[in-house]
Amino acid sequence: MINHDEWLIVGLITSPQGINGKIKVKSLSDFEERFTKPGIRWIQKETESPKKLQLISGFQKPGKESFVITFKEIKNRNEAEKLKGYKLLVKVDEIPKLNKNEFHLTELMNLKVKILENNKLKIIGKVVNLENEKNNLLVIKLLTNDKEVLVPFVKEIIPEIDIKNKFLIITPPPGLLEL
């Protein structure tokens, strides 16, 4: 299990790329250098301890939020295939400092989702995932029916985020939560 007090998930290893051990990573970060600048990186499968690897190189796929990276220790496609599903991590103490009211997307995970109903805030679900290949979308699991809905991550729909108190408020347009 990932200790979110120590680690921040910045990418998801999705597949091998080619036959020479290159790996495709879906980015959950705004900091491109995490995938392109050589140095130590950490990967983890959900139930294992983080493993240290040496990033040699990486580049962003044109028009995508994914990168192709090369680790020194991964020599071929078979080794790369074994890393599918691993998370790319950074230590929390190595996270760049953000300005006030800024946060890392992964900090939205497990936040309670509230909606204003009859002038009172009501919890309707929680953030269970992020979809960000083309647009940033929050996957929200509703309490009423366990259904998952996609909510665009835009200020008009999500006007308030309170990381410290672990909730966000949404103002969905009619029908969004019924899709």
Curated annotation (Swiss-Prot):
Subunit structure: Binds ribosomal protein uS19.
GO cellular component: cytoplasm; ribosome
Keyword rRNA processing: yes
Domain notes: The PRC barrel domain binds ribosomal protein uS19.
Similarity remark: Belongs to the RimM family.
Organism: Prochlorococcus marinus (strain MIT 9515)
Described function: An accessory protein needed during the final step in the assembly of 30S ribosomal subunit, possibly for assembly of the head region. Essential for efficient processing of 16S rRNA. May be needed both before and after RbfA during the maturation of 16S rRNA. It has affinity for free ribosomal 30S subunits but not for 70S ribosomes.
The protein's name in its UniProt record: Ribosome maturation factor RimM
Residue span, PRC barrel domain: 100-176
Subcellular location: Cytoplasm
Primary location: cytoplasm
Molecular function terms from GO: ribosome binding
Keyword field contains Zinc: no
Coiled coil: none
Domain of life, per lineage: Bacteria
Keywords tagged on the record: Chaperone, Cytoplasm, Ribosome biogenesis, rRNA processing
PANTHER family membership: RIBOSOME MATURATION FACTOR RIMM (PTHR33692:SF1)
Any single GO BP term: rRNA processing
InterPro entries to which the protein is assigned, alphabetical: PRC_barrel-like_sf, PRC_RimM, RimM, RimM_N, RimM_N_sf, Transl_B-barrel_sf
